[in-house]
A protein has these predicted regions:
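C-terminal catalytic domain of Rieske-type non-heme iron oxygenases
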Residues: 19-272
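Short Fe-S-cluster ligation motifs
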Residues: 1-27
Length: 272
């Protein structure tokens, strides 16, 4: 009552763009040229729709972790899987050679990994394979695999027979990155599914720790005074396709010699 008459709508919260897709809520603070998430992810709509993600519920909320590397080091490691046999013994035990990366095309990518038929040596993997119990609504072709769907530039949605999760990374500075994610389970989860989820989480935790170490080594190598650039092998097409997407959006990345910092915005704008 102490305020004079005025239009409250003029002083309300600012509107932002939002979209609900398969239960996930996406927001955009500023308008941009990107497609809707539904359109962007349309190549995988049938597959991801089979998991009924919108009916799943959170497990332990959102987790966060900071790592002292450039965010692009995190993304480069995550965008190729040929390091799995040497760097991730649990994943190698889970699916072995049954692992295939698809490159980024029009803003999305996919990695498919089906369980191997071999007896696992790792305790968590061995018991996970034994107890994995897919939901009744999941088609047979998705019941024995883990699949990862990349969304350019910095997000991944991963599905297993028991869970769906997202993870992403945000640059805090050129030397510090925030990792963030969440895991969701079936609403009417059985005891066996809960145990399988616990085991898959153990496998994931080991993998995350191993990947963090790889990003540290990668970041250290590029900060070395001896670093003079690199060549990508044919096995690193996932990394290359992500770099190609980056260069398209930020063309100044094509320049080999770093320009003066105060000129970066101007040069990049001229190259668009």
């Amino acid at each position: 009552k102490s305020f004079p008459k005025f239009n409250k709508n003029d002083f309300g919260l600012k509107k932002i763009e939002s979209e609900i897709w398969n239960g996930f809520i996406f927001i955009r603070l500023n308008k941009g040229p990107q497609k809707s998430v539904k359109s962007l992810m349309s190549p995988f709509s049938e597959e991801l729709g089979s998991y009924k993600i919108e009916n799943m519920v959170p497990t332990d909320g959102i987790w966060t972790q900071k790592t002292e590397v450039n965010w692009k080091s995190v993304r480069d490691v995550d965008n190729e899987g040929y390091h799995v046999p040497m760097a991730h013994p649990s994943l190698q035990d889970l699916y072995g050679k049954n692992y295939f990366d698809e490159p980024f095309v029009n803003g999305t990518s996919k990695t498919h990994a089906s369980f191997s038929g071999k007896t696992a040596r790792n305790w968590s993997v061995k018991n996970y394979k034994k107890l994995s119990t897919p939901a009744a609504h999941l088609p047979d072709k998705y019941k024995n695999s883990w699949n990862y769907f990349g969304i350019f530039p910095n997000a991944v949605i991963a599905v297993t027979p028991e869970t769906v999760q997202f993870y992403q990374e945000f640059p805090i500075s050129t030397k510090l990155t925030l990792l963030r994610g969440g895991i969701y389970r079936h609403k009417n989860e059985t005891r066996q599914q809960r145990i399988a989820r616990y085991l898959s989480n153990r496998i994931d935790n080991h993998t995350v720790a191993e990947d963090v170490q790889l990003t540290i080594w990668s970041n250290e190598s590029m900060n070395s005074k001896s670093f003079e650039g690199f060549y990508l092998s044919d096995l690193e097409y996932g990394v290359k396709s992500h770099h190609d997407h980056m260069r398209k959006q930020i063309p100044i990345l094509k320049i080999e010699k770093q320009p003066d910092e105060h000129l970066i915005y101007k040069i990049n704008k001229e190259m668009l």
